[in-house]
Design a protein with these regions (language model features):
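P-loop NTPase nucleotide-binding/switch module
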Residues: 102-146, 152-158, 176-231, 245-248, ...
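N-terminal accessory targeting/assembly segments
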Residues: 1-103, 107-110
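Short, well-ordered loop/turn sites that connect or cap secondary structure elements
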Residues: 28-31, 66, 129, 135, ...
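Short, compositionally biased
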Residues: 49-55, 85-96, 148-173, 189-205
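The Walker A (P-loop) glycine that initiates the GxxxxGKT/S ATP-binding motif of P-loop NTPases
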Residues: 236-237
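Conserved P-loop NTPase nucleotide-binding/switch module
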Residues: 240-257, 262-263, 267-269, 276, ...
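Short alpha-helix capping/helix-loop boundary micro-motifs
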Residues: 20-25, 55-61, 120-130, 165-170, ...
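Conserved, well-folded catalytic cores of nucleic-acid-processing
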Residues: 17-20, 39, 50, 63, ...
Length: 353
C-alpha cells in the first residue's frame, strides 16, 4: 500500500472528522467521486463534495485513529473494480475486496487492506478471431471456461467507437488475468477489464420487456409476474419474510447468473446465506449453486459509507455479465438500509437527505 501511495503527488491534510466523513485540504483539480487514500494507513475513500480548497471524503473503512493533520492522497481516478475470469462463486465486501481470500490470513480485515477480487490464477483461453479482423467495443475476442460457464473476453470500451484492426491475438493456451491476449490498434488487451463503479454502461436503446422471469415461486409467477429486464420491490415490515423470499428467488429463478447484495443486512442473516448457499445444488446444471452466483456481503456492522458503494458494485458486475449475453438477476437486501446510509452521510455533510 505504501508503494502505491508514493506514485501520487496530489496530497492534502485532514482538517475535520465527522464519523465516516473526513474534510481535507485538496488540490485545485480535485473532482467529485475521485478516490482518495486517507491517513497513514491509506484508508479508501471517495470525494463527495468539493468546496474551494477543501474536499469532503466519505471513507469506506473505520475512521477510528485518524487525526487532524494526517495526510490524504488524491489519486485522480474513480472507484473501479477488476472484472474477468474468477469472479463467479466469490464473496466480496461492499468495495469489492474478496472476503474469502482475505480470510485466509486473518478473520478480520485490517485497515488499509486493498486486494483485487481476481488475479493469480491461470485460465485456458480459446480465441475466436484472427489477426487482421476489425473489432469494436463489446465484440467477443474469445472465451475462457470458468466453472460451468463460458466467460467471454470482450473488447473494452477504452478502444473507442468504431472498428479497429486487430494487430495480434494470442494462440490458445493458459494465461493469467494480467496477461496480454490481444493487441488492437496498438493497445494491449488483457483477460481482465477495469470498470468504474460509478459510471453507467452506455445504452443505445431500451428493449421491450417481452420475456418473463420465472422465479420458481408459484404465488409470484401467477399473481405478480416479473419480466426479464424489469424491476420489482418486496415491501413489508420486520419479520414478514422479505429476505426469505429473495433468497428463494436467488435459488430458483431462471436467470443465468445471480448477484446477491447483502446491503446493511443483519450479520446473522448474511451468515445464514453464506452457510446455506454453498451447500445448494443448481438443478439446471447439476452443479453447486455458487458456481453461478456472486455474493456481496456488507452487513450492518460494516462502515456505513460502503453500503452505498455495494449497490453500484453489484450493478457494475451485473452489467459486465449482461454484456456477454447472459440473463443476470440482481437481488439487493435491503434498499431501505441503503437509503438509511445515504441519509446518514447527508447528515454528516450537514446537507438535505
Amino acid at each position: 500500500m505504501k508503494e502505491k501511495i508514493r506514485l501520487y503527488d496530489d496530497k492534502g491534510q485532514i482538517k475535520g472528522i465527522s464519523g465516516s466523513v473526513v474534510t481535507s485540504s485538496c488540490p485545485v483539480n480535485t473532482t467529485i467521486y475521485e478516490v482518495a487514500y486517507v491517513g497513514n494507513e491509506g484508508l479508501l475513500g471517495e470525494v463527495v463534495r468539493v468546496r474551494k480548497n477543501f474536499a469532503d471524503i466519505q471513507v469506506y473503512e473505520d475512521t477510528t485513529g485518524l487525526r487532524i493533520g494526517d495526510r490524504v492522497i488524491f489519486t485522480g481516478e474513480l472507484l473501479s473494480i477488476k472484472l474477468g475470469p474468477g469472479l463467479l462463486g466469490q464473496v466480496l465486501d461492499g468495495i469489492g475486496r474478496p472476503l474469502g481470500k482475505l480470510g485466509e490470513s486473518s478473520p478480520y480485515i485490517s485497515k488499509g487492506t486493498h486486494r483485487d477480487a481476481i488475479g493469480g490464477e491461470s485460465w485456458s483461453f480459446e480465441p475466436y478471431l484472427n489477426k487482421g479482423d476489425r473489432v469494436g467495443p463489446g465484440d467477443i475476442l474469445g472465451e475462457v471456461t470458468e466453472k460451468s460457464f463460458s466467460h467471454r473476453i470482450m473488447v473494452p470500451l477504452k478502444i473507442g467507437a468504431g472498428k479497429c484492426e486487430m494487430t495480434w491475438i494470442a494462440p490458445a493456451g493458459n494465461y493469467s488475468s494480467d496477461d496480454v491476449v490481444c493487441e488492437i490498434d496498438g493497445q494491449a488487451i488483457k483477460l481482465h477489464q477495469k470498470w468504474n463503479v460509478r459510471v453507467p454502461r452506455n445504452v443505445e436503446k431500451k428493449l421491450d420487456l417481452d420475456r418473463p422471469l420465472i422465479t420458481g415461486t408459484r404465488v409470484l409467477d401467477v399473481f405478480y409476474p416479473l419480466a426479464l429486464g424489469g424491476t420489482a420491490v418486496i415491501p413489508g415490515g420486520f419479520g414478514t419474510g422479505k429476505t426469505v423470499t429473495q433468497q428463494s428467488i436467488a435459488r430458483w429463478a431462471n436467470a443465468d447468473i445471480v448477484i446477491y447484495i447483502g446491503c446493511g443486512e443483519r450479520g446473522n442473516e448474511m451468515t445464514e446465506v453464506l452457510e446455506e448457499f454453498p451447500k445448494l445444488k443448481d438443478v439446471r446444471k447439476d452443479a453447486p449453486l455458487m458456481d453461478r452466483m456472486i455474493l456481496i456481503a456488507n452487513t450492518s456492522n460494516m462502515p456505513v459509507a460502503a453500503r452505498e458503494a455495494s449497490i453500484y458494485l453489484g450493478m457494475t458486475i451485473a452489467e459486465y455479465y449482461r454484456d456477454m449475453g447472459y440473463d443476470v438477476a440482481i437481488i439487493a437486501d435491503s434498499i431501505s438500509r441503503w437509503a438509511e446510509a445515504l441519509r446518514e452521510i447527508s447528515g454528516r455533510l450537514e446537507a438535505m437527505p
